[in-house]
Amino acid sequence: MTSPFDSKISGPARDPFAQGRPASIFIGRKASARRAVDPDVRALLREYLEDLHNGTGTRLLEELGLCQGDVRVDVAVVNGELSGYEIKSPSDTLARFPNQCRIYSKVVDRAWLVAPEKALEKSVAPEWWGMIAVFEVGDRLALRVLRPAQLNPKRDPISIAKLLWRDEALEVLRGAGRARGVMTKSRKVIWKRLIESVALDDLRAAVRAALKRRPEMIDLCQRR
């Protein structure tokens, strides 16, 4: 099958996560309107992520709710880490981004802002956030990785626990031998028991495993 990036202009490194290497330009489909909107950028980003992670056991989820739906991740990538991509198309503003950034920063291992370069320059994203510029090459949209994402230096255990559905959280507690006394309790009580009983790295791994098991996940290993 032809790659969506057969028309890409490549630098020496194909891996955008490799630091200190020139970023590649990934050219995608034509925009659906005179001015690119969210669906155009989202489609290009998905093509890029599918091409990057195909065959690696990675799964992709759109509109992943964080902190019980306070914020939704435009595109989440689940593998050995949980990465979140926030999209701002040329027709968007950054008005909501400070709150989105705050919530993302409680949960994800790596975060990316995908936006036109002018918006990236104005953003309040922390230094550990990665930045991907959206721009036009002729009549097509393209992406360039300007700054690789670093590991989130400070995640909030309770916000991570809230990614688990009630039955998923109880399963983790049963595995840790700590479910007794909370089986019929509220999610708030269950989440509290989780963060008291399970190490953060183990909790993160349990969340990733749960997300991979959910039926709405898109299995990138099976796409081609």
Where in the sequence are the language-model features?
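Interdomain/boundary linker segments immediately adjacent to catalytic/signaling cores
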Residues: T2-A36, M217-R224
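Active-site metal-binding core of divalent-cation-utilizing nuclease and nuclease-like domains
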Residues: K8-S10, I25-S83
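Non-catalytic C-terminal interaction segments of nucleic acid-processing enzymes
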Residues: E50-D51, G130-R224
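Short, well-ordered turn and helix-capping elements at secondary-structure junctions
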Residues: L64, K88-S91
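Conserved N-terminal glycine/acidic-rich loop preference
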Residues: C67, V77-V78, L82, V124-G138
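Catalytic cores of nucleic-acid endonucleases
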Residues: S91-F135
